[in-house]
From Swiss-Prot:
Chain segments annotated as transmembrane: 8-28, 41-61, 75-95, 96-116, 175-195, 208-228, 236-256
Organism domain of life: Bacteria
Annotated membrane topology: Multi-pass membrane protein
Protein name as catalogued: Undecaprenyl-diphosphatase
GO molecular function, one term: undecaprenyl-diphosphatase activity
Assigned GO CC terms: plasma membrane
Further remarks about this protein from its record: Bacitracin is thought to be involved in the inhibition of peptidoglycan synthesis by sequestering undecaprenyl diphosphate, thereby reducing the pool of lipid carrier available.
Protein's cellular compartments: Cell inner membrane
Key words, A-Z: Antibiotic resistance, Cell inner membrane, Cell membrane, Cell shape, Cell wall biogenesis/degradation, Hydrolase, Membrane, Peptidoglycan synthesis, Transmembrane, Transmembrane helix
Functional summary from the UniProt entry: Catalyzes the dephosphorylation of undecaprenyl diphosphate (UPP). Confers resistance to bacitracin.
Database matches in Pfam families: BacA
């Protein structure tokens, strides 16, 4: 992988991580288009550059995070099922699911259909306008939804936003909770993967990781702000249809 390829993947990560469209699917597809082989380092790179996206959320929500204990209670409640399931299924995810093209295609298309239906449901039944109004048991259930995102192509943000809407959060608040829940979830996943890999990267690989990190950070800052403004006057259905389209494109590249 070259430096400019790391920049492109960093931009793709920053755009797709917090939108309900699957960052994993987009990174795999982009890497294929760029001619990047899906080596162990590339797999670790795709996970590690998520730290840049995490930092963007920390920067944007820093004041709220250090002052609002009620939000942290809900983040922790939602993280519990995700942490347990992610830890138990790490080897399966790393060894089989990551790189399985059929799994990604099915996840993208099925996830798009579910997102469309969930958004329609939310038009009538989403009534909570603040994360602090969310009961802890419902926060836990959102974490269960997030656990499904261990399957490549599902989308962590997509599953948590869908879970949030089904638990009664309006679109904007569901998206915000998804952003906040990303902090412990993505940090844990990235750290665990780096420990498992032994951090055994050479100087060139570390340089590529840093470039991807910085690029994803800057891109995510812009995308998070844009997405929240978008949700003030738009639904999520467009992302559902986009997932179906990109799933078909992915299938054309990898399955036919």
């Amino acid at each position: 992988m070259t430096e400019w390829q790391a920049v492109v993947l960093g931009i793709v990560e920053g755009i797709s991580e917090f939108l309900p469209i699957s960052s994993t699917g987009h990174l795999i597809l982009t890497a294929h288009i760029l001619g990047i082989k899906h080596t162990d380092f590339v797999k670790s790179f795709e996970i590690s550059i998520q730290l840049g996206s995490i930092l963007a959320v920390v920067v944007l929500y820093f004041n709220r995070l250090i002052r609002d204990y009620e939000i942290w209670k809900r983040i922790i409640a939602a993280f519990i099922p995700t942490g347990i399931i992610g830890f138990l299924l790490y080897k399966l995810i790393k060894g089989f699911l990551i790189g399985n093209d059929l799994v990604v295609v099915v996840s993208l298309i099925l996830g798009g259909i579910i997102l469309i239906f969930a958004d329609t449901y939310c038009e009538k039944f989403c009534y909570l306008g603040d994360v602090r109004e969310l009961p802890l048991r419902k926060a836990f259930m959102i974490g269960v939804f997030q656990s499904i995102a261990v399957i490549p192509g599902v989308s962590r943000s997509g599953s948590t936003i869908i879970g949030g809407m089904l638990m009664g959060l309006n679109r904007k608040v569901a998206a915000e909770f998804s952003f906040l829940l990303a902090i412990p979830t993505m940090f844990a996943a990235t750290t665990y993967d780096l420990i498992k890999s032994g951090g055994s990267f050479n100087a060139q690989e570390w340089n590529i990781l840093i470039i991807g990190f910085i690029t994803s950070f800057i891109t995510a800052l812009i995308v998070v702000k844009w997405f929240l403004n978008f949700l003030k006057s738009h639904s999520l259905k467009i992302f559902g249809f986009y997932r179906i389209l990109i799933g078909l494109v992915y299938a054309a590249f990898f399955l036919f």
